[in-house]
Amino acid sequence: DRTTNFDLYKKIFEYVGIPTTLYKDENIVNENELYLIKNLINLIIKIKNKEYDTSFKYSFVSVARSYLSDFNDDDIFNIFLNNKFMDNEIFIKCNEIVKSIDSMSNQEILENIVDKFDVINKFISVGNIDNKTMIIDYLYKTFGDLDSIGYGIEDVSDYLDNIISKDKQIKINMTDTNGNTVKIMTIHKSKGLE
């Protein structure tokens, strides 16, 4: 990949006080947002099918420990110890989606997840809001494409599992173009700016 050293160049330029913008595609497969959406979808499917197995618990803990929830380790431990998975905001929000899941498209399910878990506003707590929003937009478009070829929510879950487990790359352009900066890009990216 010709963009391997771009981050180093950016650090050097910014060290000497020169603002820079990187023009490169980022692989989103290892981003938290992809995992969170995948785990929320898994929770919804498991609740719909009333399967409270190890996979359900794994997905629950993933969401509970994320910036989308306010659970600390003691809360999670008590939920496990007392088997109180159904008495918390994560389960309640997912169950609300389950109630109307059969009449929703994959895009509508994602929209409900983003809305009920206040995903966009929670980005503020972790920063990099624009890039995280681009990931959600990419997923929204992808879910629409999967809707158009007849994929159900279980198929979407399998699709996301496949991407993550096979370590495939999904690259999207996450360029931050703020102001008057030095632009670092490959020759191929520069051709589009002529």
Predicted regions and their residues:
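Polynucleotide-recognition surfaces of large bacterial nucleic-acid defense/processing enzymes
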Residues: 57-103, 107-108
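Conserved motor-region signature of P-loop NTPase helicases/translocases
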Residues: 1-58, 99, 108, 113, ...
